[in-house]
Regions:
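Glycine-rich FAD pyrophosphate-binding loop
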Residues: 3-20
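An anion/pyrophosphate-binding glycine-rich loop and adjacent beta-alpha core
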Residues: 195, 202-336, 407
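Glycine-rich loop(s) and the adjacent beta-strand/alpha-helix scaffold that form part
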Residues: 167-222, 384-407
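Core beta-strand elements of the Rossmann-like FAD/NAD(P) dinucleotide-binding domain
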Residues: 158-166
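Conserved small/polar residues in nucleotide/adenosyl-binding loops
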Residues: 412-419
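Short FAD-binding loop at a beta-strand-to-alpha-helix junction that anchors the flavin cofactor
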Residues: 369-387
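Glycine-rich active-site loop/strand segments that organize a redox cofactor
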Residues: 28-61
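Conserved redox-cofactor binding core of oxidoreductases
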Residues: 74-159, 171, 215-229
């Protein structure tokens, strides 16, 4: 769009951005399944799932451009899953009663990131973008109250360098690593957002932190982070704990295995409490319910802080090959970490810090309280209220980057009619 862009990342390549860890999918209101989805329904589900605390104008725009995101990504070559006839496949996610989530097995974030990286590489090749890897932003340069560049540290040489610009865009994710353990990569340190805050950018809703219900439980004293298991597993997996406290005690002592507990002694507590949604309740509901069961003594691992996510019924109904096709890489990851096969035994999961709905305050045009400083994706506060729906993080990041920021930033950097009159 005519911009010359300096792109900075703290990693050795943009391909190592934490979006690569997003597994389950990306939402869009395409209604390919003809199950009643629409732009308005996606808007409503997002606002309701966020406890009515999101900025509704931003959310409606997000729902409107969601369909364009899928078209853009397909054009970039992102290998979304397809049905037998060749049409794009969908699945359901928590907080929705329609199938609107597009996915690429359990690697959706990775494939979307590679699609975006290929487009970035093309712009680097033609000279419109210059890439700076292994740089950490230290400060925002303000001139007459407007963002006019940054100070960044070269992490290879240790030198501080300055870069001038007409506008600055922050797209650095959330602050989940403020907690001792989270699912965030260690590079997600919130240093860029904090630098903006120190310069006077407003921060909004910092208390809104999402606790994801399906993470591998803590299994050692020397962990630096927790591992996410995709919410998409709740499509076919069933969450349960024993009905009897004595069975829970045996599980915690290691004298009983989950697969040996008969069906009549299992409490599928989400299906029992929320029959309309079943296991696909919103994340905050599933996390609170799991903690409540464990606090009552029904936890299933040696710490008592885990519940079962069981695929035995899905394997019997669909066959092992179909389940492996949908979730094979996630099962492999789980087995690599825990040395337990989800095909043979129920997975153990427990809630963990995952996503931050709060962030830098932005207006409708994604500009912060500092003129010329924009914040997009997870590092702003605008779209998810008090709780994000599953598969909406990728949707927001791509909507902001592909379909909102190019136009709002262009509007900011272009001469105004008043400027033209003066000239």
């Amino acid at each position: 769009m005519g911009f010359r862009v300096f792109n900075f990342c703290i990693q050795d390549s943009p391909r190592r951005a934490h979006s690569i860890a997003a597994q389950g999918g990306i939402n869009a209101a395409k209604n390919y399944q003809n199950d009643g989805d629409s732009v308005y329904r996606l808007f409503y589900d997002t606002v309701k799932g966020g406890d009515y605390r999101a900025r509704e104008a931003n959310v409606y725009r997000l729902a409107e451009v969601s369909n364009n995101i899928i078209d853009q990504c397909v054009a970039q070559g992102v290998p979304f899953a397809r049905e037998y006839g060749g049409t794009l496949d969908n699945r359901s996610f928590g907080g929705a009663q329609v199938s609107r989530t597009f996915y690429a097995k359990g690697q959706t974030g990775q494939q979307l990131l590679l699609g975006a990286y290929s487009a970035l590489s093309r712009q680097v090749n033609v000279g419109t973008v210059k890439l700076y890897t292994r740089y950490e932003m230290e400060d925002v340069v303000l001139i007459d109250g407007r963002a006019r560049g940054i100070i960044a540290k070269n992490l290879v040489t240790g030198k501080l360098e300055r870069f001038a610009a007409h506008a600055v865009v922050i797209a650095t994710g959330g602050y989940g690593n403020a907690y001792f353990l989270s699912t965030n990569a260690m590079a997600c340190n919130c240093s860029a957002a904090m630098a903006c805050y120190r310069k006077g950018a407003w921060f909004a809703n910092p208390a809104y932190v999402q606790i994801h219900p399906t993470c591998i439980p803590v299994h050692g004293d020397k962990q630096s982070k927790l591992t996410l298991m995709s919410e998409s597993l709740r499509n076919d997996g069933r969450i349960w704990v024993p009905k009897k406290l004595e069975d829970a005690k045996k599980l915690q002592e290691g004298t009983l295995q989950g697969k040996d507990i008969p069906e009549e002694d299992r409490d599928y507590y989400l299906e029992r409490r929320y029959p309309a949604f079943g296991n696909l309740v919103p994340r905050d509901v599933a996390s609170r319910a799991a903690k409540e069961r464990c606090d009552k003594g029904f936890g299933v691992n040696n710490t008592g802080l885990a519940v079962f996510l069981d695929f035995s019924e899905a394997i019997n109904r669909l066959g092992k090959d179909v389940v492996a096709q949908r979730y094979g890489n996630l099962f492999d990851m789980y087995e690599e970490i825990t040395d337990v096969s989800p095909y043979e035994n129920p997975m153990m999961i427990y809630p963990a810090i995952h996503y931050t709905m709060g962030g830098i305050w932005v207006d409708y045009e994604l500009m912060t309280s500092i003129k010329g400083l924009f914040a997009i994706g997870e590092c702003n506060f605008s779209d998810h209220g008090a709780n994000r729906l599953g598969a909406s993080a990728l949707m927001q990041g791509l909507a902001d980057g592909y379909f909102v920021l190019p136009y709002t930033c262009l509007l900011y950097t272009s001469p105004s009619p008043r400027d033209r009159q003066k000239s």
